[in-house]
Each structure stands twice: as structure tokens, then as C-alpha cells.
A protein has these predicted regions:
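Alpha-helix capping/helix-boundary segments
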Residues: 66-67
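Beta/alpha (TIM)-barrel catalytic core signal, keyed to glycine-rich beta->alpha loops juxtaposed to Asp/Glu
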Residues: 87
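Conserved nucleotide-cofactor-binding alpha/beta core module
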Residues: 91-92
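Surface-exposed amphipathic alpha-helical tracts and adjacent flexible/coil segments at the periphery
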Residues: 1-5, 14-35, 39-53, 62, ...
Length: 259
């Protein structure tokens, strides 16, 4: 029920052990159930939420409002975070999340820095996406995979159609292009812009990782953690920190929609 069903996800037994392992080390565990559900699936999703609640998962990251309603009825003290898949991209959306009892809002990765500054004034913790792939469409709203491959991106089964080769044609004649990857966006990297996000009041950062290798995750998280520690000491970000994000396979970097 997560937006990354093809990742090497936890089973129930592994989840229980992971929660114990993390809590012994002072680390919180957030579980994603952040796809949309039809009527036949909602009870199964709720069962997963019950299991997470009973085994002390700290919060659920969710998208489906029907699931939110059911959890609020049955487990009112279970913390919920609004997933980036909810595509919260305006202040009204943040205020709705507050009224629904969310404890944190992960705003859309298409957000600008101006919006982030306003979002962080709304008296609810804001999480922003800072590193990883960006969508050629609107993340959480793309139907290209469903239309061409019968695989729903909003069910976590995106076929990555935007990453394929395409030709550009005009009047039935192919137009020369610098690349055949005409729809494939660059990867986002906001390492050098962390000071602006901290100043805005962002409470936590989101780094893509569940479909990546442990090597990629370790390098990327290490780079951003070292950057935060340097900023806390009023030190500039060293080339060594920047180079950490180039050790793993990635596309060319961009600041995405932030600036």
C-alpha cells in the first residue's frame, strides 16, 4: 500500500524488529500507506494501520482521506503525516490538513521557496523534498503510466514512461535533438540551499531512497547530515560534502521548482 511497492519493503516480522531497533537508538519510525484505495481495499489498508499502531510505529504517512477518516475513528491518538502524494501546494491545503488532525505536512515537491516560506508560518511542521527524482508531470497526479502501460502511478506502479527515449517530429519529419530522453527530468539536489530552507522554518527534509541502493542512501544522507552539522557550527559547506552526492549513480542535478 506504499507508493513504492516494488521496493524491498518490510514484512510484519521485520517491521516489529525494525521498530525495536530504532527506538532503542532514539530514532522514530514512520510507515507509508500513501496510495489511494477503492472500497475493497480500504479494510486491508486499515488492518495494516492497526498492525503499525499496535507495534508502536510513531506515525503513518498517508494520502487517502477515507483511510484518514477510519484511522481517526478507531485510533485517534495515532499520529498522521500528509504524504507528498496528497500534493499539498497551497495554504488552504495545509489548513485542511491541520483541521483533519495531521501532525506534519509533506508538501508537494513542485513547491517554490516563496510558498515554503508561507507554509512554515501555518503552525504545523512542514517537510520538504530536497534530493532525488522529480516528475515530468505533477507528482501524485500523473496518468501517463496508466494510459500507456495500464500501470497506475498513483497505486505505486509507475512504469517510468518519462524515462524512455522519444523522437521529436514536425510535419511527419524527425527534428534533430541533443538527446532522445525528451521527457526525463533531472534529479533535484538542494544541498547548497539548505540555509534558505532552515531559515524558512522547514522541520524535516525528505530524501528519495526506497528504490535506491543502500550505498546511495548512505552517501546522500551522510552528505546532508554533514551539511547540517557544518551549518550549526557556522562553517561553509566543503567540497568534500558536495562530492558525497556525486559518488552514487544519478542524473544531472537541478534545483527543480524551488527557485
Amino acid at each position: 500500500f506504499s507508493a513504492r511497492p516494488f521496493a524491498n519493503n518490510f514484512n510484519h516480522e521485520e517491521l516489529v524488529e525494525a521498530v525495536k531497533y530504532c527506538h532503542l537508538r532514539g530514532v522514530k519510525v514512520y510507515m507509508t500507506i500513501n496510495t489511494l484505495f477503492n472500497e475493497n481495499e480500504l479494510e486491508m489498508a486499515l488492518n495494516e494501520a492497526r498492525f503499525a499502531y499496535e507495534h508502536k510505529v510513531d506515525a503513518l504517512i498517508v494520502q487517502d482521506l477515507g483511510l484518514v477518516y477510519r484511522i481517526r475513528q478507531e485510533m485517534p491518538d495515532f499520529d498522521l503525516h500528509a504524504s507528498t502524494q496528497m500534493h499539498i501546494h497551497n495554504i488552504a491545503g495545509i489548513n485542511v490538513c491541520k483541521k483533519l488532525g495531521f501532525k506534519k505536512v509533506v508538501i508537494a515537491r513542485e513547491s517554490s521557496l516563496d510558498f515554503i516560506n508561507e507554509a512554515c508560518k501555518q503552525d504545523i511542521p512542514i517537510e520538504t523534498f530536497i534530493h532525488g527524482a522529480i516528475c515530468v508531470s505533477y507528482s501524485g497526479q500523473c496518468l501517463m503510466s496508466s494510459a500507456t502501460k495500464n500501470r497506475s502511478a498513483n497505486k505505486g506502479a509507475c512504469a517510468q514512461c518519462c524515462r524512455l527515449r522519444y523522437g521529436l517530429y514536425e510535419n511527419n519529419k524527425r527534428v534533430p535533438t541533443d538527446t532522445d530522453y525528451l521527457l526525463s527530468p533531472k534529479d533535484m539536489s538542494l544541498l547548497s540551499d539548505i540555509p534558505s530552507l532552515i531559515e524558512a522554518g522547514v522541520s524535516s527534509f525528505k530524501i528519495e531512497g526506497r528504490m535506491k541502493s543502500s550505498y546511495y542512501v548512505a552517501n546522500t544522507v551522510n552528505a546532508y547530515r554533514r551539511a547540517l552539522e557544518s551549518l550549526e557550527k557556522n562553517l561553509p559547506l566543503s567540497d568534500e560534502i558536495y562530492n558525497e552526492t556525486f559518488k552514487s549513480s544519478h542524473r544531472k542535478y537541478t534545483t527543480g521548482f524551488y527557485f
